[in-house]
């Protein structure tokens, strides 16, 4: 069997939304390369801008009967509609690859990931022991958040730090559902994951079932329609959407509740911190990993 491999270049701050959009458009899997600029097989030339650190290469795989020109047009349209100002996709091309080539290329990007007590394991991988580890089964590419991205890792680290047994958790922009699954496995009480995309909600439900945890997932635009209050709100999004969420998060966050945000690139950090201050959210800590930032706050009202 053959597949289409879609290859594109984009800025790092569009990496997360593009992965999510590709999944919505029917991608069978997506892989990211940060240090791709030495790959002369795929590209005829490399200029200095192309090789800058803030660019990534995205590979995404589609069934052979897919209209790839339509996929590219729809991808660009969604980016323009929802993320205008963040950039665009560049140097887009696609090619036919055989199933065995796709499978091998795909699996080499997915390995066991250890994040404190959490072990994130692709379904086809085996490890010698999971003793003292909390196992999360997660195949990459289903929707954003397979566990390997720095923003996801930092969110998992913060959940391990702040989540206490029985706490209720709201996961805004749940994507694959990985943060909801991790929260439940860490001992959370009620866990709800919300996402604006219906497909992401369906994928999250399947992942929860695979991990034998009972969670609630709901299609929602940020916190619209959410009535309950939570001990922890976690949001692995992008800076522009976090700014919108900051103005409404206290409505769903308990007094002294913890607010974990991630998906923030360096040049957007100051405006996020200013928004925390403007919305009277006390900043507890700021963490950085590979150019991405996580900001943790507290509701002190």
UniProtKB/Swiss-Prot annotation:
Source organism, top-level taxon: Bacteria
GO cellular component: cytoplasm
UniProt catalytic activity: L-lysyl-[protein] + 3 S-adenosyl-L-methionine = N(6),N(6),N(6)-trimethyl-L-lysyl-[protein] + 3 S-adenosyl-L-homocysteine + 3 H(+)
Keywords for this protein: Cytoplasm, Methyltransferase, S-adenosyl-L-methionine, Transferase
Entry's localization field: Cytoplasm
Transmembrane segments annotated in the record for this chain: none
Main location: cytoplasm
Xref: Pfam families: PrmA
Record family assignment: Belongs to the methyltransferase superfamily. PrmA family.
PANTHER family for this protein: ELECTRON TRANSFER FLAVOPROTEIN BETA SUBUNIT LYSINE METHYLTRANSFERASE
Protein name, UniProt field: Ribosomal protein L11 methyltransferase
Gene: prmA
